[in-house]
């Protein structure tokens, strides 16, 4: 993020179950804070239809209130689907809100 911190958030889901969310927040000094699902949330906002017909949540809101983080992500390019044995979407993202940020997103299981 533009303040020198780095945020990583993972959201694992299984059909019919509540997603498991966790993350880490690294400070400029190198301190790493583990974030539980009580401390960080990630919510899908916009579903995008790809040229192959797949529909994916490619815009998300990420909140970590205790750390004053509230971000909305946006993708740079939508058609980044990789049809491997385990197909997935991956690509660079930007985020704005409490900070300006840039990063990477990977989605599987869609």
Question: Where are the regions a protein language model picked out?
Answer:
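Structured soluble/peripheral alpha/beta segments that form catalytic or ligand/cofactor-binding pockets
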Residues: 1-110
